[in-house]
Design a protein with these regions (language model features):
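Tubulin/FtsZ superfamily GTPase core signature
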Residues: 1-152
Length: 152
């Protein structure tokens, strides 16, 4: 398994999530991009399958997730799972991901996208995380410019 960091600063992260597309359509709306990029921290990583079987690759991904330092606070995470053409995760693979991946993020929110629109020979996973040290349940916004009133 090959691991690559896709963004190292806030500008790169913003540009990276803004340009993510499937069949020419953006994955994240402009509001989602702003929300994710303006949090306290971020992470964008790609993992590529080498000579492992699909099950071994999922197990390595799970192990990698468990070994990395856990973030405190609230995390929104997205897993973009690049599959082979017309392939989908089996119910066993999805249950494995649900059991072993979701536990690394405690009670935080996660989304899994299965992308199978291109010819691929090896699996790839792109994981995007956006961290907030404090989580506010209600945010006051200025209707004129959409800015957070509490930060002004």
């Amino acid at each position: 398994m090959i691991t690559t960091v896709l963004a190292t600063n806030k500008t790169e992260f913003h540009n990276y999530i803004e340009q993510l597309k499937v069949k020419g359509k953006r994955i994240f709306s402009p509001d989602e991009v702003e929300y994710l990029a303006n949090n306290d921290g971020f992470e964008a990583v790609e993992l590529k399958q080498e000579d492992e079987t699909d099950e071994e690759f999922l197990a390595l991904f799970s192990t990698w997730l468990h070994e990395r330092p856990q973030q405190s606070g609230h995390t929104d995470y997205y897993i973009l799972f690049y599959l082979r053409t017309s392939e989908q995760l089996t119910s066993e693979q999805f249950e494995y991901m649900e059991r072993n991946v979701a536990e690394c993020f405690e009670t935080n929110h996660g989304w899994l996208y299965e992308l199978n629109d291109r010819l691929r020979f090896r699996l790839r996973i792109r994981m995007i995380c956006s961290y907030k040290k404090t989580f506010r349940r209600l945010v006051r916004k200025d209707w004129r410019n959409g800015m957070d009133i509490n930060k002004q």
